[in-house]
Amino acid sequence: MDSIEKVSKNLIEEAYLTKASDIHIVPRERDAIIHFRVDHALLKKRDMKKEECVRLISHFKFLSAMDIGERRKPQNGSLTLKLKEGNVHLRMSTLPTINEESLVIRVMPQYNIPSIDKLSLFPKTGATLLSFLKHSHGMLIFTGPTGSGKTTTLYSLVQYAKKHFNRNIVTLEDPVETRDEDVLQVQVNEKAGVTYSAGLKAILRHDPDMIILGEIRDAETAEIAVRAAMTGHLVLTSLHTRDAKGAIYRLLEFGINMNEIEQTVIAIAAQRLVDLACPFCENGCSSVYCRQSRNTRRASVYELLYGKNLQQCIQEAKGNHANYQYQTLRQIIRKGIALGYLTTNNYDRWVYHEKD
């Protein structure tokens, strides 16, 4: 029987090679089960004895500096491992259940971020996103659910800006998912008093040209971000809204007035990470092997709101008559399916059934 150290290392290496985003170690009444999340699918990897599961979770808790003896409360931890294939950052989260603790591991490989033209399904959209970086100040907002690729897009834009514009770029994230030696990266640490709002205030005194704000979570952070955008800084950030228009109303909920939105917001991009059609599987990949053998399995689509269309949407939010016309996520995904780029399940997963 392999040692628990070897089991844990093999598990991480396999997840890395499979390009899994998460590992789920789930205890059951008599045994346990391990799942890999590959793309959007949760795929069963193996069964495990209950005793081995408890030892494995305890081992990961020890490595990530959690309290091994505490099994009644949820805990979080993280660590970075050096594998033969490269470095990987792991974010751990335990959850007490009726069948012992469950553990989910977020797997974040530390390799180069693809350029925006390789991320975007449609090259024209990627070129438009890059054009926004020419602005010296203002705010560029990305919206979408967790796992829609917002952080990857932000870092792809950061790399482009660093290479072509030579700017002083500072990021504020919770947590820092991708390490980049070319930018100053600050991690939110609420226990130490480094909240989003406090961290952003400190960054403004550090002579930044470009600020990457992981997420606008509260009214104070929104206010400081808007102030930064109005005083000569280019701010890239994210919000959780269903579509691009929703970001306007979200900022209003945070107490940002219409004039400030008009003066600062350059563009809003609603993003989704969609499954590309597999040349081998008619109804989408069902096996880990098939998913692993394809280098490019997903791409990003963006609903872009900028220029006249953005101004018209702001007018609509004011209660005025508006006339705008831009491609919605529904139309973009439908176009991708019609061209044979995307699987039909993308439509059911990401599109809300409403009028265009």
Swiss-Prot record:
It is found in: Cell membrane. GO terms for molecular function: ATP binding; ATP hydrolysis activity. Keywords: ATP-binding, Cell membrane, Competence, Membrane, Nucleotide-binding, Transport. It is a peripheral membrane protein. ATP binds at residues 144-151. PROSITE patterns: T2SP_E (PS00662). CDD domains: PulE-GspE-like (cd01129). Disruption phenotype: Transformation deficient. SUPFAM superfamilies: P-loop containing nucleoside triphosphate hydrolases. GO terms for cellular component: plasma membrane. Signal peptide: none annotated. Changing residue 150 to Q: Cells no longer transformable but still undergo competence-associated growth arrest; protein localizes to the cell pole. GO terms for biological process: establishment of competence for transformation. It comes from the Bacteria. Required for uptake of DNA by competent cells. Belongs to the GSP E family. This is Competence protein ComGA.
